[in-house]
Amino acid sequence: DLPLKEQIDVLKGMSAGEIEAAYHKPGPLGGHNWHPMSFSPDTGYVYIPALDMPFGYGNEPGFVYEEGRWNLANDWRLGMPTGEKSVDSKVDGLLRGFISAWDPVEQREIWRIQHAGTWNGGMLSTAGNLIFQGNSAGYFVAYRADTGEELWSAETQTGAIAPPVTYQVNGEQYITIVAGWGGAFALTAGAAEDYKLKPRGRILTYKIGGDVELPPVMDQDPIVPDLPELTAGEQEVAHGKFMYHKYCGVCHGPGVRSGGVIPDLRY
């Protein structure tokens, strides 16, 4: 992970003009959101699907209260994509997540599994020293509950945010997870380019000895329309960016990059 000061420097590079701003970590989604934790009586640990996401807060220039709007008076341009891949990739790299194995008696972290992305799934603890989690990278994974060692994984072809469940039928154990990229973060995650993060919802069930394979992904690339010649000036473009992030970006995505939950306005 980048030191906090370097993370702040990256985010400041995204600021819209000379706007007084503060960068907080975790952001408004918290260090842990609704994704269920789990507890293992075998280890005594709690397993937390944690979020590691900064957020930029700054005063919206000329804020005026509007009926029916969010009215947070925050400048949503802070931290939004610039269109420069070298800059935007650094900001995307700040959005992380991890599993924290926490000892509630000693009040300390025992081990941590770092994820490449944020908004990962809820946890399941089972007997046999196992924990399970689906993640935003499109995998369903089993770990050792005592050490965090990865033992098994299966590709889900979509991000998974729900917790898995386990049950028995005629004495045979199954584990089921509802896989699909969605929720508050996914609404504006701007992940439409990544096939694993598209909202391809399905119910996946596993058992020892199961041998069914998922069919190949058959997504069709979106048709990109021919863009009209830009006639607006620099100030008009900047104002349009401000208005978009104020009124549209919260659902349709930062920098007009939709997470795929609702239509992408670029196509």
Please identify what each model-predicted range represents.
Residues 1-226:
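Beta-sheet-rich non-transmembrane sensory/scaffold domains
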